Amino acid sequence: MMSSLSVEGMLLKSARESCLPARVNQRRNGDLRRLNHHRQSSFVRCLTPARVSRPELRSSGLTPPRAVLNPVSPPVTTAKKRVFTFGKGRSEGNRDMKSLLGGKGANLAEMSSIGLSVPPGLTISTEACEEYQQNGKSLPPGLWDEISEGLDYVQKEMSASLGDPSKPLPLSVRSGAAISMPGMMDTVLNLGLNDEVVAGLAGKSGARFAYDSYRRFLDMFGNVVMGIPHSLFDEKLEQMKAEKGIHLDTDLTAADLKDLVEKYKNVYVEAKGEKFPTDPKKQLELAVNAVFDSWDSPRANKYRSINQITGLKGTAVNIQSMVFGNMGNTSGTGVLFTRNPSTGEKKLYGEFLINAQGEDVVAGIRTPEDLGTMETCMPDAYKELVENCEILEGHYKDMMDIEFTVQENRLWMLQCRTGKRTGKGAVRIAVDMVNEWLIDTRTAIKRVETQHLDQLLHPQFEDPSAYKSHVVATGLPASPGAAVGQVCFSAEDAETWHAQGKSAILVRTETSPEDVGGMHAAAGILTARGGMTSHAAVVARGWGKCCVSGCADIRVNDDMKIFTIGDRVIKEGDWLSLNGTTGEVILGKQLLAPPAMSNDLEIFMSWADQARRLKVMANADTPNDALTARNNGAQGIGLCRTEHMFFASDERIKAVRKMIMAVTPEQRKVALDLLLPYQRSDFEGIFRAMDGLPVTIRLLDPPLHEFLPEGDLEHIVNELAVDTGMSADEIYSKIENLSEVNPMLGFRGCRLGISYPELTEMQVRAIFQAAVSMTNQGVTVIPEIMVPLVGTPQELRHQISVIRGVAANVFAEMGVTLEYKVGTMIEIPRAALIAEEIGKEADFFSFGTNDLTQMTFGYSRDDVGKFLQIYLAQGILQHDPFEVIDQKGVGQLIKMATEKGRAANPNLKVGICGEHGGEPSSVAFFDGVGLDYVSCSPFRVPIARLAAAQVIV
């Protein structure tokens, strides 16, 4: 092949070598064996326009090649191609083809292309999966022929054949969607074995290895393809170990394993009424079908729902020649991250098992050893692994999750993908990689997910030293953070308890992908088996869920719903605390403390703030809330709900009730005079906390009945009689007058202030007295008064008149004049429709998206739970509209009102103050329609800041 390139091949030698990765060039002289098969593919890539342009070649004095490429690698048209091969330094795909090849397939192709040792294989595309689903869950026409053609390539590369006892070719069959879904879809290893093939394999590689591989295949194929519970195979294994008096699988002899194979084959007959299929080609077809089927499995669907993964065509299928980590003490398998996924520390973080296969580590079947043990027992393979990690991290410019196998001291790379990480890890990795000049700040902003920040805002233990006497066990610190909850033993119970508002600690011997719903619902996860890279650990870290894994001291009894630690018994419902940072298991409920911003997070958030256009405010009702908001980076208060201040003490609520029960304006004014100093004091505290930043104060909004006592009517009357000094008859009459059929659409918002102007007057007087008082103390106060529930311009005009009159009086009395704004909440659809009229009166609009959603859909927030889950399950709604803004309906009202309002008033400030202001996809929409700010709860402020930046980058 190379001779056909002759002259141009010699001329382009320097260009070819310059295209090799830097680390590969460094290793060239020391490892020619690994580079020989790499050179041809590197040569082809160097001639590809995407890699080296023609102008670059001309500038070097070299002539661009022409038809010379055809003998090396024929052009590939991917329009209808469904099977792509890779391995031995060449591939038909690359990392940019994730949507077609899935993440695993695209990265296998890429690793092959950059010269790493990847076992040859083929990838069946995600489009083929989509066709499979559309074809009644059967392989579409022609696909099997394409698979067979790809298999021929693998057989030629490996000089072996599927099903040939003299030259056996065991295969792995793995799933791989475009977005990583750890453990959610299926894998089959050692495919192609039967009695004849395993005998041939035994002759070549030893009987113990061959029959160990065979029993693993029978177990995995039976579970994944035939639907036989793994526990039925595990029972046979545990029974045999008990009979032999051994504890480890590795202590079983070849004869033991051969006997175990027969027991496993009997499981097929007992469980399914049919024998294990011995035809390797049939095994492959069934395995491909099973992987395609796993795309639509309940656990995969639930994982996609939890993580809001949509728009994917399906999973790819990766069929790859097997390499074996279970061929004795010179073999092994491992999983690693190029940096610590929990902390972000720049240090290899992983685990390794000698004489084992990959699923033993990933599935948590055996608790592995630290990666450092590999350096001692396999130094050459370890050195090469470290070099490969440097190559991959430099190539992808990200922290990578890598699976590898060592077969008789030779390293093979089985998978690489962008590594899942905790919030803490994500931020540190992003900051470090910017400092290392690997990425720029805009890339860093894209690398950290909003969910990562959510994790960082979770509490930690208040005083770890205080609970040391209650630590009963220590496992592996698989996912950091603190969790406190009641012990439960099934995923179903965890989901049920979560729905009931209970905090659950899910305790399992080991988690499986079927547990994904319960893992998401639980406050924390504790497992007896599994390492730092087990299913439980990887999934928990991705969600920021506290997890302690591999806690060997605990014994879990699911049937009795208990677990034991020595003589101690912990029952279902007992309180337990977990420290995912240290791995400690602690009895009882331990106190939690709010989180604090790290230096890395402050640096990262400063980049986000520089990038974003949208301002981020906070909804805060007390001075403490305001201080928290400011510490979290809020640029002001977008919603201060005055009514929340009324519940701060018994004296305040009693004064409110006197105001509500008042019969005459004079009585009402007496009660309001009692409330004024309370409101003024709170406003002073908020203005002080927000020195130099705007504070938007909403006038009283909720229906008055919300301030009355709860309980039966007699209790309410008695309590009000004590609070107000009124007679029972007077109170009964007043309560009857306050009663409403639909209070949320009744006597509330600006309707209160118009009916009782003295109510608006009291609140506004308190606001401006506090503003002037703080100004006199050197605080810069920027007050904004918001009138709620406006549906007509006349309503707003009325309240503005009252507000401006009170402001003028206060300024005259106190001798100070301040600038201020008066605006309104747009929460009634009619207000959005006539926004140009309202905009003429207002200084600002703030969309109250909670009520606007309620009134636009006609859904009562208090009752929507009765049918919302049904709507979501049936696809009638894609999201809860009270969490994610409805862009087609409510969103269009917001867009229209913004445009109309600004047409009437070009200086109109526009924002939103519903909880949608902290939801990332909603923030992106608000930025797109040109709002000036969003306002959300104090703890969601960093999330909104990042979401607003990610829209820009």
Curated annotation (Swiss-Prot):
The modification Phosphothreonine is found at residue 533. Its cofactor is Mg(2+). NCBIfam families: PRK05878.1, pyru_phos_dikin. Belongs to the PEP-utilizing enzyme family. Loss of activity below 10 degrees Celsius. Activated by light-induced dephosphorylation. Inhibited by dark-induced phosphorylation. Both reactions are catalyzed by PDRP1. Inactivated by cold due to the dissociation of the homotetramer. Its main location: plastid. The lineage of its organism: Eukaryota, Viridiplantae, Streptophyta, Embryophyta, Tracheophyta. Homotetramer. It is found in: Plastid, Chloroplast. One of its GO terms (molecular function) is pyruvate, phosphate dikinase activity. Keywords: ATP-binding, Chloroplast, Kinase, Magnesium, Metal-binding, Nucleotide-binding, Phosphoprotein, Photosynthesis, Plastid, Transferase, Transit peptide. Residues 55-74 are annotated as: Disordered. Pathway: Photosynthesis; C4 acid pathway. This is Pyruvate, phosphate dikinase, chloroplastic. Changing residue 885 to L: 50% activity in the cold. 65% activity in the cold. Pfam families: PEP-utilizers, PEP-utilizers_C, PPDK_N. Mg(2+) binds at residues 827, 851. Substrate binds at residues 641, 698, 827, 848-851. Gene3D superfamilies: 1.20.80.30, ATP-grasp fold, A domain, ATP-grasp fold, B domain, Phosphoenolpyruvate-binding domains, Phosphohistidine domain, Pyruvate Phosphate Dikinase, domain 2. It comes from Flaveria bidentis.
